[in-house]
Amino acid sequence: YLESDLTDYNAESVKADWGLYFRPWANDFEIQYVGKVGTGSTIYQGAQRYRIDGFSLQQHKLEVKNDNFFVRGYITSDKAGDTYVMDVLGPNLLNAWKDHGTWFGEYVGAYASATLGGATGAEAHAAARATAEMGRPQEGSAAFNRLLDNVTSDTNFLTGAGFKDNSKIYHGDANYNFGDLVSFAEIQVGSSYRTYRLNSFGTIYADAEGPISYSELGLYTQLQRSFELNESLELKLTG
């Protein structure tokens, strides 16, 4: 089969984002929710060649803040849609119709028979292929489309070409500025936390038995003080 028989070269991308901002009390206190979503299809060329079909990515953020602090959290998730690896699609599609061992056996037998009958190499090859590929579904036929659907939805790369991904990232940040409470310096403390949840069902990561999760945590503090040495020179120390 030609690659054009096995895939769709159309590319598309749809994106949207929105936000809700609420200030219930003072102008410096705000609650906000921001969402982003995108979906698309294309051909991707890397170490292998992929048909990215119906891939989607979304992110949602909730944040509470004022002039002295903020607390915010994100969740980012993706879905692979009906994506498949084009490198293995052709061979596995043919193997699903007729296993490679049977095909090569029929080919070799027909080639040898044609050669013994006086055919040239090109003639023997044509006759052998015609014998081995008798009944092969034609591209676009109902039988071909059934095979294509079965192989692209099969995530075992020995027999199929599809892969799945439904990974997520959870992230949170918090920061407080003691500027209104301490006058001799500007003091800030904060933290950052992130959890990765890899979930490719064994098609990308080694997670066939279940999602892989791992986390990161960071803490920080900052002290800053300014010294006005004269009207045109100021010294800032940060630690």
Residues of each region from the PLM?
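Structural signature of outer-membrane beta-barrel domains
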Residues: 13-15, 27, 34-42, 72-81, ...
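Amphipathic, alpha-helical segments enriched in basic
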Residues: 30, 37-39, 46, 90, ...
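Transmembrane beta-strand segments that form the barrel wall of outer-membrane beta-barrel proteins
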Residues: 35-39, 45-48, 233-239
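Extended, low-complexity, charge-balanced
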Residues: 56-58
